[in-house]
A protein has these predicted regions:
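Membrane-embedded multi-pass helical conduit in multi-pass membrane proteins
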Residues: 38-41, 300-395
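Cell-envelope/extracellular polymer assembly enzymes that use nucleotide-activated donors
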Residues: 45-48, 78, 232
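Short, acidic, metal-binding catalytic loop of nucleotide-sugar glycosyltransferases
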Residues: 65-76
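A conserved acidic beta->alpha catalytic loop
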Residues: 83-94, 113-115
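Catalytic donor-sugar/metal-binding loop of nucleotide-sugar-dependent glycosyltransferases
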Residues: 235-254
């Protein structure tokens, strides 16, 4: 029975994950309905753009410039660079760029209080925000130049409270694990987010999220003690019946980079997993009205524990497969998870083709071979990060493990 339950759990998780990834292709009308507007309204809404940063000397100055260069009237934009006092390098880069721009609407907010976390900095930025709409870009982001026109038009036309636009990692071939990391983002924002929005339970992405300031203030801003403040805010927006819109087009994604080492990747994924665990035990998701919303929230938030469980049980399952005699029907059943993994692998190959085509890059058979070889090691890394997240949560460790950025998506390698 124990072995049977492991198999059922693995099969369910694999099939539902495949369902999420294929949703937008199964129902292409959702993609059409959530396209960016082709004709922009005259700029009307004002925007406050929060740029939190920590130890981002390598990328921050260029990011401030790229955000300032967005195709939108400068008098309708407020840009707030957010740094902590103990980060003189990033502060110096930000101040140098702000002095160069010479625009009073581009400001530097320096704080020295606690907690030391991204959402705390965001809340301080919210206190001085003047825009009708508040948004966040990460320190290495490259938003599309027309993103504010898109959001301005979308929010006015649909009387929308919040918009999640697409985010995409771009350096798919700089490290062996980058292929699958890039595809996670590709499927998540292109397909899965539309499924979440349809159900009415949307764990928001970390940036390129646009929320009306008054609503954000009513909700109390971001949870300063949560490691995934974006997803937690998404739950509260769903509870408040906010009118949320998902927009995804490959042309308009905000470009980012993957972590540049396996250690950085594990630390990043650990933080995300632990944040989901925090939200799970906060129990706010249980207040969602519909059973489908609560079940979906539970599935998304329980994934870290499921991955950790798989990491523990997989060796046990392998030992039992070779040394325990099973009935024929159960022995045949043990191959179903393998078939699901193979299907997921082919789906990743198809996703790589779609990603390359969408961003005008050439298909290379060598890259597809690397993806295939990396598939199972990548799953083990995810399981390790999940185990680490569970361990940290049990231990009571919740410090913010920062992901370093070096601008890989801005180099020729990422092309």
């Amino acid at each position: 029975m124990f072995y049977f339950l492991i198999i059922v759990l693995m099969v369910f998780q694999a099939i539902f994950n495949i369902r999420l990834r294929l949703f937008i292709w199964e129902k292409p009308e959702h993609a059409w309905l959530n396209r960016a507007p082709t004709v922009f309204r005259d700029p009307c809404l004002t925007f406050t753009i929060l740029l939190p940063a920590k130890n981002e000397e390598d990328v921050y100055r260029e990011t401030i410039q790229k955000v300032y260069d967005l195709n939108y009237p400068k008098e309708l934009m407020q840009i707030i660079a957010i740094c902590r006092e103990d980060d003189p390098g990033t502060i110096a880069e930000a101040q140098a760029k702000i002095d160069e721009l010479g625009d009073p609407n581009v400001q530097l907010l320096i704080y020295n209080d606690y907690p030391v976390s991204k959402p705390h900095g965001l809340n301080l930025g919210l206190q001085v925000a003047r825009g009708d709409v508040v948004t966040i870009f990460d320190a290495e982001d490259e938003p599309h130049t027309d993103i504010l026109n898109i959001i301005n038009t979308t929010m006015i036309d649909g009387d929308i409270d919040a918009v999640q636009s697409g985010v995409q990692l771009m350096n798919h071939n700089t490290r062996w694990f980058c292929f699958l990391n890039v595809l996670e983002y590709f499927f998540w924002f292109k397909s899965s987010m539309h499924f979440f929005a349809r159900i009415g339970m949307t764990p928001l992405g970390g940036n390129t999220v646009f929320v009306r300031r008054e609503l954000l203030e009513q909700l109390g801003g971001w949870d300063e003690n949560c490691l995934t403040e974006d997803a937690e805010l998404g739950i509260r927006l769903s509870l408040s019946h906010a009118r949320l819109r998902i927009i995804y087009e490959d042309e308009y994604v905000t470009r980012e980079e993957t972590p540049h080492t396996i250690e950085q990747f594990i630390r990043q994924r650990t933080r995300w997993n632990q944040g989901f665990i925090q939200i799970l035990f906060k129990l706010e998701w249980l207040k969602l009205e519909k059973l489908s919303q609560r079940l979906l929230a539970f599935y998304v938030l329980i994934l870290p524990e499921v991955q950790a469980l798989f990491a523990i049980l997989l060796p046990v399952a392998i030992i039992m497969f070779f040394f325990v005699k099973f009935p024929l029907w159960l022995a045949m059943l043990t191959f179903i998870p393998l078939y699901c993994f193979i299907l997921s692998l082919f789906l990743d190959l198809a996703g790589l083709h779609e990603f390359l085509k969408a961003h005008n890059r050439k298909w290379k058979w060598g890259e597809s071979i690397i993806l295939v070889l990396a598939f199972f090691p990548y799953q083990w890394i995810l399981s390790l990060a999940a185990l680490r997240a569970v361990y940290r949560e049990i231990k009571g460790t919740s410090n913010w493990e920062k992901t370093a950025h070096i601008g890989q998506h801005r180099s020729k390698i990422a092309a």
